[in-house]
């Protein structure tokens, strides 16, 4: 078994080897932002750069962000929820997109951590009246599983979900888009182990505009 420190070190090193620069964890209590009590996701302190600001460390970043999620408090004590945790994240600022993002994530889990590819599942956005199905991610997953000798089918290894499960956006609007989550089968239950968010839209009011 790996400790959380060993997993963090492997993650940072893996993405540094793929031309990412490590950035520090932002303060747990947000500076100049009253919208949340604590930073609750690795993406939170990077939103200005996802909106177009230039990051001093470049366009490929990796970090381990300290987080607290008050909405998870009732779940603390089971095998999947913690009071506080570190969220590992790799970030592409107008650099690579879906194909390389999903490839890197899967490669880290399978080749660096030794996860069994046969126990890995993916979810993708199924589309709705305001945003189309993420067919690109579906095709990427089918081809990646095929490289490992798996004939992945939608509805089996690749599951389609709605906005409640496979969409990221801020309540205040701004950049948003579909995501593709990765799950690992543990004792017959699928446990989320990773997520790639794709900022393809700008939400203005109730309208989603392609970026």
What do these predicted regions represent?
Residues 1-211:
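Structured aminoacyl-transfer and RNA-binding surfaces used for tRNA recognition/handling
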């Amino acid at each position: 078994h790996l400790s959380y420190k060993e997993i963090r070190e492997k993650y940072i090193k893996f993405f540094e080897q793929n031309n990412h620069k490590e950035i520090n964890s932002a303060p747990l209590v947000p500076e100049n932002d009253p919208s949340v009590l604590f930073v609750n996701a690795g993406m939170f302190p990077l939103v200005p750069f996802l909106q177009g600001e230039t990051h001093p460390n470049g366009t490929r970043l990796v970090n381990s962000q300290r987080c607290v999620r008050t909405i998870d408090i009732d779940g603390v004590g089971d095998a999947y929820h913690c009071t506080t945790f570190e969220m590992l994240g790799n970030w592409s600022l107008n650099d690579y997109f879906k194909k390389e993002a999903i490839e890197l994530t899967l490669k880290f889990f399978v080749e660096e951590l030794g996860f069994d590819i046969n126990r890995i599942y993916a979810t993708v956005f199924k589309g709705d009246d305001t945003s189309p199905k993420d067919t690109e991610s579906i095709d990427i997953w089918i081809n990646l599983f095929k490289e490992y000798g798996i004939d992945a089918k939608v509805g089996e290894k690749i599951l389609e979900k709605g906005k409640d499960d496979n969409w990221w956006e801020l309540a205040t609007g701004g950049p948003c888009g579909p995501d593709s989550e990765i799950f690992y089968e543990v004792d017959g239950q699928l446990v989320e182990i990773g997520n790639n968010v794709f900022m393809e839209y700008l939400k203005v009011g109730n309208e989603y505009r392609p970026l």
